[in-house]
Curated annotation (Swiss-Prot):
CDD domains linked: Ribosomal_L16_L10e (cd01433)
Name of the protein this chain belongs to: Large ribosomal subunit protein uL16c
GO molecular function: rRNA binding; structural constituent of ribosome
InterPro entries: Ribosomal_uL16 (IPR047873), Ribosomal_uL16_bact-type (IPR000114), Ribosomal_uL16_CS (IPR020798), Ribosomal_uL16_dom (IPR016180), Ribosomal_uL16_sf (IPR036920)
Assembly and binders: Part of the 50S ribosomal subunit.
Organism the protein comes from: Gracilaria tenuistipitata
Renumbered residue ranges of the record's region Disordered: 1-22
Length: 135
């Protein structure tokens, strides 16, 4: 699964997810893409499950690009722990996604194949997405 090799700081604030994506909202590498319509924290597990779904559907047909990376650590405390004594340990990593961000791109396959692969992939995600093509 995806996670940073090293970070400047071990823990982060949660922060807000206001507005739309200003970067990463156009197709850069492939011909077809999966674009988000809602804000979300995508976990490394969700990204990996989606990647595997697309890869299995297109087999060796096309090239796939993952346009997101989980670089935000989410901490959690053990169950039944008293308050205090600092912030919990890093539990998992998430990618902060705003509406309009491109998640996956695909090239080298037909439009029908790409559309079906992205449809199956969208079932693995907790948000609404849309299939877009390069102009």
């Amino acid at each position: 699964m995806l996670s940073p090799k090293r970070t400047k700081f071990r823990k982060q604030h949660r922060n807000r997810m206001n507005g739309k994506a200003s970067k990463g909202n156009t197709i850069a590498f492939g011909e077809y893409a999966l674009q988000t319509l809602e804000p979300v924290w995508l976990t490394a597990r969700q990204i990996e499950a989606t990647r595997r779904t697309i890869t299995r559907y297109v087999k060796r047909g096309g090239k796939i690009w993952i346009r997101v990376f989980p670089d935000k650590p989410i901490t959690a405390r053990p169950a039944e722990t008293r308050m205090g004594s600092g912030k919990g340990a890093t539990e998992y990593w998430v990618a902060v996604i705003k509406p309009g961000h491109i998640l996956f791109e695909i090239a080298g396959v037909s439009k029908q194949t790409a559309q079906e692969a992205m449809k199956l992939a969208s079932y693995k995600l907790p948000i609404k997405t849309k299939f877009i093509t390069k102009q």
